Amino acid sequence: QDGIIPTEEELSESWKRLASLYAEFSKICAVSLAYLDPQGNLVCKEYYGENEKAILEALSVTLNNMQAHNSQYRLVGHASKYFDYPYTSKRYIINELQIPNCLDSSNLKPWEGMNLCTNELWKCGGTGAGSSLQALCNVLGVPISKVDLVGDEVGSAYFRKEFARIGRYCSYDSVATFNIFRKFKQEDIFEFDQVQYITAYSEDMVEKEVVEEQPLLQKIYKATNIS
């Protein structure tokens, strides 16, 4: 930048800070979806782990099921118009997976997208960078994440394999975004302890299923030997 060649140390530090912003150099390790069930309860589904492809496949199942029940449903995210939606779509392509219909904008004109972004809504038709999720939570009186983790610390948490912690961090952000959207519509918001958290995918679940299946397989094997 400005004709100055960065040192190896500076490049290393910038890589740690900026690589996660690019779908080409990073991966998804956690996703959360917050939604109201038919009884009006707030449910938050968490998908987390090291296997990105499995996370995206599980996410597709949920998104496609939601669309099957309501073809007009929309996704809502914060600063998602220029990051979360395109980033997630790119990771689907990189993993050679079909993009869920609700994220696929390939056949849409720029003004035809149905998904919403609270950052764009907060601009109220104006221009500018908008506001951070935390700033909006503060000014609107919305509960802020209770996980002692911020965005630029997720990478370190990933390498420590703290996937459940990252998943809950994402869930609290999803709930906060949900509450902000309800504030825009003058509706009541939810406290974090009023939310039903569901682990929709984690590698611990897969490992548990394998462990639980082993005794049954052993019994079948032994029974076969006896006969």
Predicted regions and their residues:
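Conserved RNase H-like, two-metal-ion catalytic cores of nucleic-acid enzymes
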Residues: 1-65
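Acidic catalytic cores of enzymes that act on phosphate-bearing nucleotides/polynucleotides
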Residues: 197-198, 203-227
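Metal-dependent phosphoesterase core characteristic of DEDDh/y 3'-5' exonuclease domains
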Residues: 26-41, 67-168, 172-194, 201-211
